[in-house]
A protein has these predicted regions:
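N-terminal targeting or regulatory segments adjacent to alpha/beta-hydrolase or S9 domains
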Residues: 1-53, 236-267, 386-388
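N-terminal cap/lid segment of alpha/beta-hydrolase-fold proteins
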Residues: 29-86
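Short, surface-exposed "cap/lid" segments of acyl-processing enzymes
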Residues: 78-110, 122-123
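Catalytic nucleophile-loop/oxyanion-hole region of alpha/beta-hydrolase
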Residues: 99-107, 120-158, 168, 173-176, ...
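Primarily recognizes the serine-hydrolase "nucleophile elbow" in alpha/beta-hydrolase
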Residues: 141-225
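Accessory cap/linker subdomain of secreted extracellular hydrolases
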Residues: 188-309
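C-terminal catalytic histidine-bearing segment of alpha/beta-hydrolase fold enzymes
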Residues: 199, 263-304, 308, 335-339, ...
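Short beta-strand/loop motif that positions the catalytic acidic residue
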Residues: 314, 320-322, 326
Length: 388
């Protein structure tokens, strides 16, 4: 409780500084929203705003015998067809916690109290820890549902994506079905290229500014998603089971593997041998080389989910955020996204923090975190200026 009070006091000071520095309505609203986003200190927004209106809707058809994917809509209490609100679509990543998780509800509730309509889609595929190309279409369909609401102002529509959801958000925003309506996209902790991301998880390293590898330890979740994805590239069941038995648990434990000639020699397919070589790659360059040897279908999939390769069709303003100590996705992935979108004339802001555990607030000392909180305030304010 003492820590929360200190953070609350610190946030109050930041509120005063921000509003005094730039006393605009949006600056004040941003400052009031921040405690809700960080779940820290008193939350004055809850005291001086009406509770949002909330409802669930299916946003894409289900396969026969399956339940449809649902999205949660949060509307400001005052929103109506006569007084529409700007809106945000929140897209979460692989193995996300779902639209009813308290942390997600807190963020959606705070945004709606601030005056923004919010839609949070759930995806069975992502909740199961899998990523498929069809998830881009899912984001498009969720956006269409949000844009069709009479309480929503179609001139003030944006997408906020977290982690893999940020990559999906950038790809969906370029889809011709919705690209004319997407005013802005904010990607937080996204990857630019699935091949460099997979190689980083394999090699426990990412490329530094001088081109030399920088040691990096991916999280258990990152390793689990990586292993699941790579095993899915092996069609032969016996080969897939052999790779799973030989390597999965060791990768989950964080072990750096070496080539196992006995396992490799028993594999029947080229795809399985390539996955073996990736699992046991001795360096970042070797991992990148192994990815290039994957089957053509796998390479097409990697291309399809890599937003850094698909800027065409995107006309929205692009905002990027990343934690510099991120162990889910290396922060250099957002730097690559920034470079690509700046060249395309789309980048509006790229902010790096030392404040979060991937995309969730970290447990930091307030004094050390104060400059990062200021950066967060300024970044979020820009998004609210697009929406309010």
């Amino acid at each position: 409780m003492g820590r929360l009070r200190r953070i609350g006091l610190g946030l109050l000071v930041l509120v005063v500084v921000l509003v005094a520095w730039e006393p605009t309505r949006v600056a004040f609203q941003t400052a009031m929203l921040l405690p809700n986003l960080l779940d820290a200190g008193p939350k004055p927004l809850n005291l001086f705003s009406a509770a949002p209106v909330r409802a669930s809707f299916p946003y894409r058809a289900a396969q026969p015998g399956e339940e449809p994917d649902l999205a949660e809509l949060w509307l400001p209490a005052w929103a109506s067809a006569e007084r529409p609100a700007g809106a945000m679509l929140l897209v979460f990543g692989v193995n996300n916690l779902g639209r009813n998780h308290p942390g997600i509800e807190r963020v959606a509730d705070g945004l709606a109290r601030t005056g923004v309509a919010v839609l949070v889609p759930d995806s069975h595929t992502l909740l199961e820890g899998r990523l498929e190309v069809g998830e881009i279409d899912g984001v498009v369909r969720a956006f269409q549902l949000l844009a069709a609401r009479p309480e929503v102002d179609r001139e003030r529509l944006g997408i906020v994506g977290f982690s893999v959801g940020g990559s999906l958000a950038l790809l969906a925003a370029g889809d011709p079905r919705i690209s004319p309506q997407v005013r802005w996209v904010n990607a937080f902790g996204a990857f630019a290229d699935a091949s460099t991301y997979l190689a980083a998880v394999s090699a426990h390293a990412y490329p530094g500014t001088d081109g030399e590898p920088v040691a990096w330890t991916p999280t258990l979740l990152a390793r689990e998603v990586y292993v699941r994805f790579m095993l899915d590239q092996v069609d032969d069941r016996d080969d897939r089971d052999a790779l799973d038995a030989a390597f999965s648990e060791r990768i989950f434990a964080g072990e750096r593997l070496v080539r196992d000639l006995a396992v490799r020699g028993a594999l029947e397919t080229d795809a399985a041998r390539t996955v073996h070589d990736l699992f046991t790659a001795p360096s970042l360059d070797a991992a990148i080389g192994s990815i290039g040897e994957l089957p053509s279908d796998s390479l097409r999939f990697i291309d399809a989910i890599s937003p850094g390769r698909h800027v065409e069709g995107l006309s929205a303003d692009v905002y990027l955020m990343h934690e510099t100590a991120d162990h889910h996705v290396p922060f250099v992935e957002s730097r690559e996204l920034a470079s690509v979108h700046e060249q395309a004339g789309l980048l509006r802001e790229h902010t790096e923090f030392r404040l979060f555990d991937h995309v969730q607030p970290d447990d930091l000392d307030l004094i050390a975190a104060a400059p990062e909180l200021v950066k967060l305030l300024l970044h979020v304010r820009q998004l609210l200026e697009e929406s309010l």
